[in-house]
Amino acid sequence: EDDVEIGPNSIVDRAALGETIVRKGAKIDALVMVAHNCQIGEGAILMAQAGIAGSSRVGRNVFLCGQAGVADHLDIGDGAIVAAKTGVTGNVKPGAMVSGSPHLDIRDWRKFWASAPQVYELVKEFKRLKARS
């Protein structure tokens, strides 16, 4: 459609049976892969080295940040933000912000990584106590 930009070395696969559609105003950065039968919504921005597997739908005004990957047959809701290097393995709700691999809601992802040092210390303490018994 109109006002679409596709950066260098990016690939938009042609569909065999359905349609691959990049809607009005979408921006596809360099080295992005859009597989067959995908739909990219109006105003979506796909950043460098992102990849979308076959038959997935990216909604309107979605940000798919660098090196993020979307598995096949998934739906990324309107206005969602997929952080860099995220591996999307399930549908993403409209307006959601996800990160990690596999993807988590950004709030859960932050809690998970904030607790990682504590978990490490708990494991060390457990091993110390186990060695004493």
What are these regions (language model features)?
Residues 103-133:
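Long, leucine- and charge-enriched amphipathic alpha-helices
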Residues 1-105:
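Structural signal for interior beta-strand "rungs" in well-ordered beta-sheet cores
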